[in-house]
Curated annotation (Swiss-Prot):
Record's compositionally biased regions (Acidic residues): 79-93, 175-187
Protein's UniProt name: Nucleolar complex protein 3 homolog
Organism: Homo sapiens
A family per Pfam: NOC3p
Compositionally skewed regions (Basic and acidic residues) per UniProt: 66-78, 160-174
Cellular compartments annotated: Nucleus, Nucleolus; Nucleus speckle
């Protein structure tokens, strides 16, 4: 007969890699727990056995019964036989019965057993031997009164079966003390020697020593992996296992160090291509040692990278769920620090390894954290996404992030942080056109004419050239070089998802705090919107403004978006958006020094798009009205806002030269200026003057003074009234940011005052009053004469 084959397979390297250290530790703990349970059970049984032996010595022995003879039929027959045997006792005298009872108490165990035991089955010889052995054991005669017993299961020993009984539990202080002593003995056996209590200084020294050892171990492993990643890939698993550090003194610090170390290691040793899993055919084919070694390295790297990301995800989940582990090594407060380090590592990997495996998994982890309640984590994730958008030239990674963000915003019913949508502003789509004309695309010719072939190359040369082109094409694909067509396709798809998200919010969540971010995004990407949607979009923006539910900043964003749409592909529509000019003219006076400066920046951008870039569509009356209102506004805002507004006024005066009539001081005109009218076309701005510039010449800020004097002189480009190049070459927005007081600093810096000179006492002609000077000279030149002083007359007068 053949030997039975062992069907259990040896676990592969991949399976061993998948076995985490947590599982191994759990198995070890279960094994130790089982051993302790078995030891406790054995000790308990030994204690019960000792108690049973004590009871058996001091108590009446119990007759044995044959367990096989418990059938109801035989039991009835046996009872009948006993009744028949008991019949003659009725015929005996009472004295004889009493005598037999007295003798029965003093009879030997053998006689009592034979008289009371039931007949044994003849075929069961084995049972008879057991009884014989049991009978040979010496017993003591029970003379004490019987106690209530509880029969337990018998114990089989080398000497035979030992009956086990127990008294009915009675409260006995002595026994309780004995049990407590035995329990203490067991605890002392299990518990090791107690750790000596350390002082705070000793504890800190011990912790520092442990931490230094762990740091050296981490550094050694990291150096070995960096020096030779292919041969030391197994050490990556050893380093990752330190993420489960169990020493409560250094657990949190060690885990943070390991997280950062692994993050830097993966950034350094990860190849610049995506590792795909091997097919069955590739696994079955024989390869060289170098290729096999490379495959094992790639497989180990991907698996360890996957486990590392799972560990980071688990740390974030533990912090979000506020759950304590069974080991209780890390406190709830420490979970937040671990989660912050884990999120930071995920953000670094998101930006550094957009081409590598599991990048989409990292995106799925990062996007919900952009909306986290913790401001630090939310800003960290948003900044990482912005960096990814800025450096992503091809657009593959950006498309993945945009898809997840769009789905997340829709799933949360548009109740998310505005910072999530503001990340869209960093997309690199402005450089690429959405659509190209068919005339601009020159399709390559498939065939050459006979003359072209004859002029250019020979047949063999064309063959070599074709092979070179094929090789170059394969190299470009291997190097993942940017393809214009692929880039255009990805950017188009990304932009479609962005606009779908924006239009959903405009349609369903018009009162959402996301509206400013949506309008700002539409303003940036408006030149890429299809012309077919322009009319509908302008109607929606005008409806939002007229509703009155928006703040002045949101209204300004609507105006800015509308003019960005019209400045791009909207030029062909030939639309005069007078209602948007009117709204901006009306909104200007809502800005003041007590409001935020963000509104001023939006106003400067709107004026540039509405007046400067659309100079041909702007009438002179409209330009005059805006210049007059801007100069009035410059009196009510902060210095940096005044500088930006005056710089815009200077540009408008250069763009519309006929507006210099506002600098004339004529007392006559064709009407009366209506400063409170909100219609720029009908406020008669040509009948007023820019008297505000004279007030601004006395402003405390020196740059405001220069701009006011420059505008009063007619904004000349040369001469004494011209501005310095450092002011004239900058745009209004740049000047607004350059002279901002957000950092509580004054630009230009205030000159330090001269130190105070200590005054000296001067005599003689230094006094300005001539009479006082002469009086001092006269008294100083007189000679003092000694005369007795008598104050009695003054005292007498004061007494009376």
């Amino acid at each position: 007969m053949k030997a039975r084959r062992n069907k259990k397979q040896i676990p592969s390297f991949r399976k061993l890699i998948k076995t985490s250290k947590v599982k191994l530790e759990n198995k070890l703990k279960n094994k130790q727990f089982k051993q302790q349970s078995t030891l406790k059970k054995y000790r308990k049984e030994q204690r019960k056995l000792r108690q049973a032996v004590k009871d058996a010595v001091s108590k009446k022995p119990i007759p044995l019964e044959n367990p096989k003879e418990k059938r109801p039929g035989k039991r009835i027959e046996r009872e009948e036989e006993e009744e028949e045997e008991a019949l003659p006792l009725d015929m005996m005298d009472e004295d004889d019965l009493q005598l037999m009872k007295d003798l029965g108490q003093r009879v030997s165990f053998l006689t009592r057993d034979l008289s009371s035991s039931e007949p044994v089955h003849a075929k069961k010889r084995k049972h008879e031997r057991i009884i014989d052995k049991y009978e040979k054991i010496p017993r003591t005669l029970q003379t004490a009164p019987e106690k209530e017993l509880i029969h337990l299961l018998p114990i089989k020993d080398k000497s035979g079966i030992i009956p086990q009984t127990r008294e009915k539990p009675v409260t006995d202080s002595n026994k309780d003390e004995e049990d407590q002593e035995e329990e203490r003995e067991l605890e002392e056996e299990i518990i090791e020697d107690p750790i000596q209590e350390l002082t705070i200084e000793e504890h800190l020294i011990e912790r520092k020593k442990k931490l230094q050892e762990k740091k050296m171990h981490i550094a050694a492993l990291a150096s070995a992996i960096l020096s030779d990643p292919e041969n030391n890939i197994k050490k990556l698993k050893e380093l990752r296992s330190m993420l489960m550090e169990q020493d409560p003194d250094v657990a949190v610090t060690v885990r943070k160090l390991v997280i950062v170390s692994l993050m830097e290691l993966f950034k350094d040793i990860t190849p610049s291509y995506k590792i795909r899993p091997l097919t069955e055919a590739e696994k079955s084919t024989k390869t060289r040692k170098e290729t096999q070694k490379l495959r094992e390295f790639e497989e180990g790297l991907v698996s360890q990278y996957k486990f590392y990301l799972e560990n980071l995800e688990q740390m974030v989940k533990d912090w979000k769920q506020r759950k304590l582990k069974k080991s209780n090594v890390v406190s709830l407060k420490a979970y937040k620090g671990l989660a912050e380090v884990a999120v930071k590592s995920l953000c670094e990997l998101l930006v550094a390894l957009p081409h590598f495996n599991f990048h989409n998994n990292i995106i799925v982890l990062i996007v919900p954290l952009m909306n986290d309640m913790s401001k630090l984590i939310s800003e960290m994730c948003c900044e990482a996404v912005k960096k990814l958008f800025k450096q992503d030239k091809l657009g593959q990674a950006s498309l993945g992030v945009i898809k997840v963000i769009s789905g997340f915003v829709k799933g949360r019913n548009y109740e998310v942080r505005p910072e999530m949508l503001k990340t869209f502003l960093c997309l690199r789509i402005k450089e690429v056109e959405v659509k190209k004309d068919t005339e601009d695309i020159n399709k390559p010719k498939k065939f050459m004419t006979f003359k072209e072939k004859r002029k250019s190359l020979s047949r063999m040369q064309r063959k070599w050239k074709k092979a070179e082109e094929k090789l170059e094409r394969e190299l470009r694909e291997a190097e993942a070089s940017e393809s214009t067509e692929k880039k255009l396709k990805l950017h188009t798809e990304t932009l479609n998802i962005v606009f779908v998200t924006y239009f959903r919010i405009l349609k369903k969540a018009q009162r959402s705090p996301l509206l400013p971010a949506v309008l700002e995004g539409l303003a940036k990407f408006a030149h890429l919107i299809n012309v077919e949607f322009f009319d509908d979009l302008l109607v929606v923006l005008h409806t939002l403004i007229e509703s009155g539910d928006l703040s002045y900043q949101e209204s300004l964003h609507c105006v800015q978006t509308a003019f960005h749409i019209l400045s791009g592909q909207g030029d062909v529509l030939n639309i005069d958006p007078l209602k948007f000019y009117t709204h901006l003219y009306k909104t200007l006076f809502k800005l003041h020094a007590g409001a935020t400066n963000e509104g001023v920046e939006i106003v400067l951008q709107c004026l540039d798009v509405m007046l400067t870039k659309r100079r041909k569509q702007v009438s002179q009356q409209r330009a005059l009205a805006f210049i007059k209102r801007l100069c009035t506004l410059a009196l009510h805002v902060l210095p940096n806002s005044s500088i930006g507004i005056l710089a815009t006024t200077r540009i408008l005066m250069h763009t519309f030269p006929k507006t210099d009539l506002l600098l004339d001081s004529e007392s006559q005109g064709s009407g009366v200026f209506l400063p409170e009218l909100d219609e720029p076309e009908y406020c008669n701005a040509q009948n007023t003057a820019l008297w505000e510039l004279h007030a601004l010449r006395r402003h405390y800020h020196p740059i405001v003074q220069r701009f006011a004097a420059h505008l009063i002189a007619g904004a000349p480009s040369e001469g004494s009234g011209a501005l310095k190049p450092e002011l004239s070459r900058r745009s209004a927005t740049e000047l607004f940011e350059a002279y901002s007081m957000a950092e509580m600093t004054f630009n230009p810096p205030v000159e330090s005052s001269n130190p105070k000179i200590k005054g000296k006492f001067l005599q003689g002609d230094s006094f300005l009053n001539e009479d006082l000077n002469q009086l001092i000279k006269r008294y100083s030149s007189e000679v003092a004469t000694e005369s007795p002083l008598d104050f009695t007359k003054y005292l007498k007068t004061s007494l009376h």
